[in-house]
From Swiss-Prot:
This is Putative trans-acting regulator SP_1800. The lineage of its organism: Bacteria, Bacillati, Bacillota, Bacilli, Lactobacillales. It comes from the Bacteria. The keyword Nucleotidyltransferase does not apply. It comes from Streptococcus pneumoniae serotype 4 (strain ATCC BAA-334 / TIGR4). Keywords: Transcription, Transcription regulation. Pfam families: HTH_Mga, Mga, PRD_Mga. InterPro entries: BglG_antiterminators, HTH_Mga_DNA-bd_dom, Mga_HTH, Mga_PRD_dom, WH-like_DNA-bd_sf.
Length: 493
């Protein structure tokens, strides 16, 4: 979807991503090679992004350029900026909110000619069709195609473009939706939390706009759970919620509307409760197959990485649901900001073999069930496994062999012991810290020693397979940071 940005904006976004991700010096020539453009273009882009993002501090020197005050929150601001300043995305959003308007009104809104509008819509459709099954029509002005894809695309778009606390939907206030969701939480065992609540509100309000313009999803009766719909329609308090919908939205909360709002969660392959899922494992051959595939996969991972799976059935339930909500919950696929993919990559940087095995087996699971097994879906399912497995990170870290650390000082033995004790307290328990006790010291003796890391306040020549930390005054704060960082570099090598 990044091709909906102009070439210049696309390049500037990639430029900022490079500077954010690597947090190091880049020469313009290197950036030009990475971005496949001229050094002049890089120079112009740097000038533009410095002006567009005054809160970011760019540091230039003979070493090149870098951003020196970045943190993980700043990058989100970058994506919001490119969404906001993209004509293509802005026109898409305008049409979503104003279906049925005249094409001339779009031209007036964006100060473009009729021919320019048709050219832009043609470009939008060309890019969208590479990934989604829908298109924009100007005769009349509407968005048509696969309704599931349309609803997912725009819900994901709103989640990426707007900040977490923003609510950009003028036609639908959030209160009646919150009332409806709270009723669902009360009447079912659906897990309620802040992020899930916001995700559902975004999905439901997107569905409401589509319903308002007369677009409904086709419901396969064979895969639809009528009992869930009937249960909700008979829930205590539904009348009050229906009145709020009628008065604030001018929409009747009848069975058809409720079905359209929750169609993803009323499908038979989605289980709102773990106990219902476990009962169905014994009755439905497809669910049984899904369960046993995941069970075998989890057992293999548990044995290979010596992880005790405390919540195996609960984890299988979550994985099964996730696999059957393709393009029906946020972050399955991204528009510009691959936030979930970045999360997986960060975890993979620490545990590369583990994540590689997870992805391989989950891809096999999806393919066997003949559901979507795209790389983004595999990432999405891998995220569910990693975050929903109890104490996963703790278990993986505890199973790592401890790093042996030698501390030496040219002051005296007491100084070395003081540093070792301090580091032992502040660093993780994945280190064994010792001081040098022999009377003599040589490079050869250090080469033959069992230590992985050597800390000293005097210079030691480079030693193969040893990580050396030289600190003239042994700055404890810096050492704590360096030592913990080295632990993560070592993991799963």
């Amino acid at each position: 979807m990044r091709d909906l940005l102009s070439k210049k904006s696309h390049r500037q976004l990639e430029l900022l991503e490079l500077l954010f991700e690597h947090k190091r010096w880049f020469h313009r020539s290197e950036l030009a090679e990475l971005l496949n453009c001229t050094e002049r273009a890089v120079k112009d882009d740097l000038s533009h992004v410095k002006s567009a993002f005054p809160d970011l501090i760019f540091h230039s020197s003979t070493n090149g350029i870098r951003i020196i005050n970045t943190d993980d929150s700043d990058i989100e601001m970058v994506y919001h900026h490119f969404f906001k300043h993209s004509t293509h995305f802005s026109i898409l959003e305008f049409i979503f909110f104003n279906e049925g308007c005249q094409a001339e009104s779009i031209c007036k809104e964006f100060y473009i000619s009729s021919s320019s509008l048709y050219r832009i819509i043609s470009q939008i459709n060309k890019v969208i069709k590479r990934q989604f099954q829908f298109e924009v029509s100007l005769t009349p002005v509407q968005i048509i195609g696969n309704e599931r894809d349309i609803r997912y695309f725009f819900a994901q778009y709103f989640s990426e473009k707007y900040y977490f606390l923003e609510w950009p939907f003028e036609n639908f206030s959030s209160e009646p939706l919150s009332q409806l969701l709270e009723l669902v939480y009360k009447e079912t065992s659906f897990p309620m939390n802040l992020s899930t609540h916001r995700m559902l509100k975004l999905l439901l309000v997107t569905n409401l706009y589509r319903i308002k313009f007369g677009h409904f999803m086709e419901v396969d009766k064979d895969s639809f759970n009528d009992q869930s719909l009937d249960f909700l329609m008979q829930a205590e308090g539904i009348e009050g919620v229906a009145q709020s919908f009628e008065s604030e939205y001018n929409i009747s909360l009848d069975e058809e509307v409720v079905c359209q709002l929750f169609v993803s969660y009323f499908q038979k392959m989605f289980f709102i409760d773990e106990s219902l899922f476990m009962k169905c494992v014994k009755k439905d051959s497809y669910v049984e197959k899904s369960y046993h595939l995941l069970s075998d996969f989890i057992d293999q991972i548990s044995v290979k990485y010596q992880i005790e799976m405390e919540n195996k059935d609960n984890l299988i339930w979550h994985l099964h649901n996730t696999a059957h909500l393709y393009r029906q919950e946020l972050f399955t696929e991204f528009i510009l900001f691959d936030q979930k993919g970045n999360t997986i990559r960060n975890f993979q940087n620490i545990f590369p073999k583990f994540v590689s095995d997870i992805k391989k087996e989950l891809s096999h699971y999806l393919e066997t069930l003949e559901v979507c097994s795209s790389s983004m879906m595999v990432n999405h399912l891998s995220y569910t496994f990693i975050t929903h497995t109890k104490h996963l990170v703790i278990n993986l870290l505890q199973n790592q062999p401890k790093l042996k650390v030698l501390v030496m000082s040219n002051f005296d033995q007491y100084h070395a012991k003081f540093v070792a004790e301090t580091l032992s307290y502040y660093c993780s328990n994945n280190f064994e810290l010792e001081v040098w006790t022999e009377l003599e010291l040589s490079k050869e003796s250090l080469e033959d020693s069992p230590y992985d890391i050597i800390i000293s306040n005097f210079i030691i020549p480079p030693i193969e397979n040893k990580r050396l930390i030289y600190s003239n005054n042994i700055n404890t704060v810096s050492l704590i940071y360096l030592l913990n960082a080295m632990m993560f570099i070592r993991l799963d090598e």
